[in-house]
UniProtKB/Swiss-Prot annotation:
Source organism of the structure: Caenorhabditis elegans
Signal peptide, first to last residue: 1-21
Lineage: Eukaryota, Metazoa, Ecdysozoa, Nematoda, Chromadorea
Role played: Intercellular signal essential for a variety of patterning events during development.
Start and end residues of each stretch annotated as Disordered: 236-258
Listed name of the protein: Warthog protein 1
Family annotation (InterPro entries): Dev_Signal_Hedgehog-like (IPR052140), Hedgehog (IPR001657), Hedgehog_Hint (IPR001767), Hint_dom_C (IPR003586), Hint_dom_N (IPR003587), Hint_dom_sf (IPR036844), Intein_N (IPR006141)
Amino acid sequence: MMVMNPLTATFLAALIGTAASASCGSSGIPFRFEVLPSGQPVLGCGSPTCFGAENGGRDLRHDSSFMAGADGDDGFFRDGDLARVRVRDPDAPAQMANCPREFSSSSCSNPMTWVGGFKASDNGDLSLQCCHYEGLRFAQEVGRPVVHPGEVYSGGEVLRDGRQTGFDAISNVRKITSGDGTVAYEVTVTRMNCLPNPGEESNEVSFDIQRDIGRILDKVGETAASGVQTNHIEADQRLSPSTDVQSDSYVSPTEADPQEPVEQFVQVGEQVVPVTSAGYYYPVASGVPACFTGNSKVMTPAGEKSMADLSVGDMVMTYEYGKMTYTRVASWLHRLPDTKAAFIKLTTEQGAIIDMTPQHFIYKANCVTEEMELVYAEDMTIGDCLMVKENEKLVMTTISEKSTFYETGVYAPMTETGDLIVDDVYASCHNVVKANTLSHTFLNFATSVQQKMRSVLGSLEETGHLPATSEFFLNIIDVLLPHKY
């Protein structure tokens, strides 16, 4: 029998009796908020390529802090973020947050702040650490998901056409208590500009400034003369994620009364790119994860089950090695029953119908060779081919209809094989990130390590969510690997 040192026991007792506190520090941004089944909140922090350093990107502060409890740490920092090399000009301003030492705020309502940390009491009340960052000056709120016990919200890097353009941070957290005493948290998500630093310290540029400016002005003149439509931006006109957007984004100025001249923005050097499908508006990564609906159906050995009723450890049908088989649900990427999102509905000629968010991956089949590739659901068009289940095999069918709708409840299970059959359609578990084999190798390793750590710490409770290290890996792998491989 192991006897604990009295000093160690006293120290552990002091920790247990102290309110849990988590802080991302001045080099971290809060991007993930999880509520364990026990009610303990967990804060996830990251330091993207556009943030975290001072003195030309050379110095980062390792001042984040987290506290261990019965259910594990109350926060974490993404592995590798603070070790990443940042290439910036030596005179570049610091990209760090100014965080107070105290956790004394009940709300981070200042638009220039985010929730750098929190101190949680036993009843779920949070005392917030509101960190100020100048880079939030042009940020915009994009959503307010509600996270209940056993659920998780994850923001982070925002990619458009494979390029990082922003970062979704948690700017405020508000406790919500229902009539039956259940505690949940409303998370305010703010999107800030987050362009990655260049890959090199310097590059050659032309020094003929007059010639270059002249070429740009000539290009603007040619564009205007050729009748290219420009967008008129009126004062105080803003589009929010909930704004209805038509397929034509041109705003015609009213002709009733003379108004002040409006400013014209002309994009020089790039072609005008039309909307993929007229009539659709997808709030791309607008603080809402890529997932399936709660009504989506999967097949288990015991019969059909809806996504909302699925649990970690369940066996679901997939297609592997040329035949139908079952794979285990290893974790949840996202499980947010109260979050509203835009979904795409794909109807096939065979009769199968699948609903998923625009940036969830699905297997598109070559209609001639049946060779499959992963593409975003939003990139599928009428006439494209999908693989659907028929008896005990996959057969090819074409998409006959495509529509969009809004629904509450988003679910993204992660299986051990990385794919599954949803509503008889062969689909991927992944969103934003395609890499299947590599990410699952890492996922299995990280899950194994986490389980061993729990057994050492004496906590056997399974939260059913993606391990922190895997969350980081899945968020950045699209940057590390080419899109075609």
